[in-house]
């Protein structure tokens, strides 16, 4: 079943963010663009490489009005311990959401019940709280923050320009397409 245009559910979870624990809720997400970046577990192998890659691009996400939330089924205490012990994770400036009850992972349909962890899922959420893009990778396949940034930018563009679409490999400032009978069979 597709998650596109699904409104995210109500939630309140604890996060580790900038040296402190704080609650994050759906109300904090609404009104701006957001990325929910689910990963299986703290203290693992592919996860820190992805989170570091995302940390290196965080300023670019912020510049386009997009907040990033990493999410695992670990507690906020485990997030802090990982942050304090890993040079890669110390680079994170975005909130690390704790989902020990699996409520978020279940709402986003990435919970692996037999393992008690989330799949490697990425969700772009618009300011109205609806999922507009997502992908779920196999556990051993890491994601690319540059491509995720491009996807968010494309989602923002089509959100603002409803009659235009972004073709493959589109980058901000590049040519877009408009729905037109003249294009049928011409591409």
Located regions from the model:
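Chalcogenol-based redox active-site neighborhoods
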Residues: 1-187
């Amino acid at each position: 079943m597709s998650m596109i245009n699904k409104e995210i559910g109500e939630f309140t979870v604890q996060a580790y963010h900038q040296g402190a624990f704080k609650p994050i809720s759906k109300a904090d997400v609404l009104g701006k663009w957001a990325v929910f970046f689910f990963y299986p577990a703290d203290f693992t192998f592919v996860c820190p490489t992805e989170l570091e890659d995302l940390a290196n691009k965080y300023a670019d996400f912020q510049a386009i009005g997009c907040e990033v939330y990493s999410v695992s089924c670990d507690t906020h205490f485990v997030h802090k311990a990982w942050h304090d012990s890993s040079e890669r994770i110390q680079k994170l400036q975005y909130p690390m959401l704790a989902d020990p009850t699996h409520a978020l992972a279940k709402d986003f349909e990435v919970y692996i019940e037999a393992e008690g962890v989330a799949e490697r899922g990425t969700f772009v959420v618009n300011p109205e709280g609806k999922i507009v893009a997502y992908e779920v990778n196999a556990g051993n396949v890491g994601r690319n923050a540059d491509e995720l940034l491009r996807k968010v930018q494309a989602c923002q563009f089509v959100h603002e320009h409803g009659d235009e679409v972004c073709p493959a490999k589109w980058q901000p400032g590049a040519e877009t397409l408009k729905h037109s009978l003249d294009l049928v069979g011409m591409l």
